Amino acid sequence: MVMGLIGRKVGMTRIVAGDGRVLPVTVIHVAPNTVAQVKDIATDGYCAVQVATGTRRPQRVTSALAGHFRKNGIAPGRLLREFRVADTANYACGMDIDLDIFAEGQRVDVSGVSKGKGFAGAIKRHNFRSNRASHGNSLSHRAPGSIGCRQTPGRVFKGKKMAGHLGAEQVTTLNLELVRIDANRRLLMIKGAVPGARDGDVMIRPAVRG
């Protein structure tokens, strides 16, 4: 895997491309990303770069995390994320990762926490078809139907699609087009929708299937 950036979702808008097409884009603001730790095979068993973004008041940082930042000589960050890399030779603690690691027209993968929907039924959560509206149906219009068999196996299998908590989980959208980069305002404009609500944190990486 290769390096990426941590950003914050601003919202969606539309822009006019050079060929006249009107494109729906998600705007992501990328605050300065600073290398907080470099991991290699000798010490950690794998190669990765830990990145910090944003700022946090010292009194809001736990002792363990404050020691981690102090050891590596950087100011406490609001958020820590890790990116796997093939080689860590080009990275050092304290260096900034800028928007120039991406280029306009490049394909990217965006990861974020999806919007939480709370407790949802099987129809909304798993896209089940609703039951018949009439003709003998009583109070089972949105019921999931049968969830098992009989005495054998005598249980409901794990993973059965049923009602439960919907959303608020890590989601990655693949192969999105990075339409425009505004370096002055530190904005990335990505075609289409990305996971999460406004002001949610997202991770942007070069596409693995691009």
Curated annotation (Swiss-Prot):
GO terms for biological process: translation. Keywords: Methylation, Ribonucleoprotein, Ribosomal protein, RNA-binding, rRNA-binding. Transmembrane segments: none annotated. The keyword Transmembrane helix does not apply. GO terms for molecular function: rRNA binding; structural constituent of ribosome. The keyword Transmembrane helix does not apply. GO terms for cellular component: cytosolic large ribosomal subunit. The modification N5-methylglutamine is found at residue 151. Residues 131-150 are annotated as: Disordered. Pfam families: Ribosomal_L3. Residues 131-140 have a biased composition (Polar residues). Methylated by PrmB. Belongs to the universal ribosomal protein uL3 family. Part of the 50S ribosomal subunit. Forms a cluster with proteins L14 and L19. One of the primary rRNA binding proteins, it binds directly near the 3'-end of the 23S rRNA, where it nucleates assembly of the 50S subunit. This is Large ribosomal subunit protein uL3. It comes from Acidithiobacillus ferrooxidans (strain ATCC 23270 / DSM 14882 / CIP 104768 / NCIMB 8455) (Ferrobacillus ferrooxidans (strain ATCC 23270)).
